[in-house]
Amino acid sequence: MHLIGEQGVGILLLVVLALQGGAMFACTGRFLQIKPEGQNIVMMENCFNTAILILFIPLIAVSLIIGWYQILDLTHLAIAIPWLIYGLEAIGIALIICGTAMVVFGFLALRNTFQPGGFAPRSQDSLVTWGIYSLVRNPLNAGVLSVTLGLALVVQSLFVIALSIIYLIMVLRVLSIEENQLSEAFAEEYRSYSQKAKRLVPFIY
């Protein structure tokens, strides 16, 4: 890690967690929910998402700050090409920053309509289509994916890459459930919105 050093990356990750946590607590919707019957993939995705944010990323951040990361991560890739290292780190840092912005603005836009992924809209909920939601329909998932992938590029870790892939698979499964729920709850309004805003990657997908 040459661009900002291991301690710099660790501090960046702690700032990311602080911003995301602050935005989440500013959101007035319910967070804890009863597990919906027959939706095991929903519970798995929510637990995995929580583990990434409150376990994996903090542990990686602390190990980077105290200089233990490369000792603890046996899947670290020892890349010997300087320009490739700098390129991966630059792209990774950009993804971390962009992903954090998506999560923060996503929480702030949702506020009291927020629910964990895979839960059907409540009767008092309205469809949020403004702010970051005008660009992408799932900024919270997209943001966490972006942060995780960015971290994998910065630390060059097969373990973190595997986390990103597993999380992506879970997210895609849960998004199919969510989209059906939103389509039933908001009918034509959601179908029209889904034609304007991308699913996960602004302007692309």
PLM feature spans:
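Membrane-anchoring alpha-helices and their flanking helix-loop junctions
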Residues: M1-T129, G150-Y205
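Membrane-interface loop-to-helix entry segments
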Residues: T129-L145
